[in-house]
Swiss-Prot record:
Required for rescue of stalled ribosomes mediated by trans-translation. Binds to transfer-messenger RNA (tmRNA), required for stable association of tmRNA with ribosomes. tmRNA and SmpB together mimic tRNA shape, replacing the anticodon stem-loop with SmpB. tmRNA is encoded by the ssrA gene; the 2 termini fold to resemble tRNA(Ala) and it encodes a 'tag peptide', a short internal open reading frame. During trans-translation Ala-aminoacylated tmRNA acts like a tRNA, entering the A-site of stalled ribosomes, displacing the stalled mRNA. CDD domains: SmpB. It comes from the Bacteria. PROSITE patterns: SSRP (PS01317). One of its GO terms (biological process) is trans-translation. InterPro entries: SmpB, SsrA-bd_prot, SsrA-bd_prot_CS. GO terms for molecular function: RNA binding. It is found in: Cytoplasm. NCBIfam families: PRK05422.1, smpB. Its main location: cytoplasm. This is SsrA-binding protein.
């Protein structure tokens, strides 16, 4: 009579920001909650979210996600004015905000979102303290990636 309980992964990815990994060296990662309205959660459940050109700013001791695009569902657009590009407050500890703000001010780093995921029943965003790559660094990363692929191809065909 033992029932097997299927465990879902605790963290299900909703959206990735691949461009951030291409444009920045990630130094440290943080997980933050998001303050969302009901229609925004429904849009996220439908997968209508994009993080490509988004970033984090600090205003009056709070962290805000700017540029994340949440497209409203068609039925929401009928009865309310939904702004898909509005800024959304990030939920972080005071200590984490201080650490991020200090690194941005002193070291010239930036804070970018890496992914949006479900943690239990809450939407979380993984943000990273990052340093921008220069053009030659991006080219070097691409060359290294292509070399790894070629190496695996050769080893696979000979092995």
């Amino acid at each position: 009579m033992n029932k097997q309980i299927s465990k879902k992964p605790a963290q299900r990815t909703i959206a990735l920001n691949k461009k951030a990994l291409h444009d920045y060296y990630v130094e440290q990662r943080f997980e933050a909650g998001l303050v969302l309205e009901g229609w925004e959660v429904k849009s996220i459940r439908a997968g209508r979210v994009q993080l490509r050109d988004s970033y984090v700013v600090f205003k009056s001791g709070e962290a805000w996600l700017i540029g994340a695009h949440l497209s409203p569902l068609p039925n929401v657009a009928e009865y309310m004015k939904a702004d898909p590009q509005s800024s959304r407050k990030l939920l972080l500890n005071k200590r984490e905000i201080g650490k991020l703000f200090g690194a941005v001010q002193k070291q010239g780093l930036t804070v970018v979102p890496l992914d949006l995921h479900w943690h239990k029943n809450h939407v979380k965003v993984e943000i990273a303290l990052a340093k921008g790559k220069k053009t030659h660094d991006k080219r070097e990363t691409i060359k290294r990636r292509e070399w790894e692929r070629e190496k695996h191809r050769v080893l696979k065909s000979h092995g």
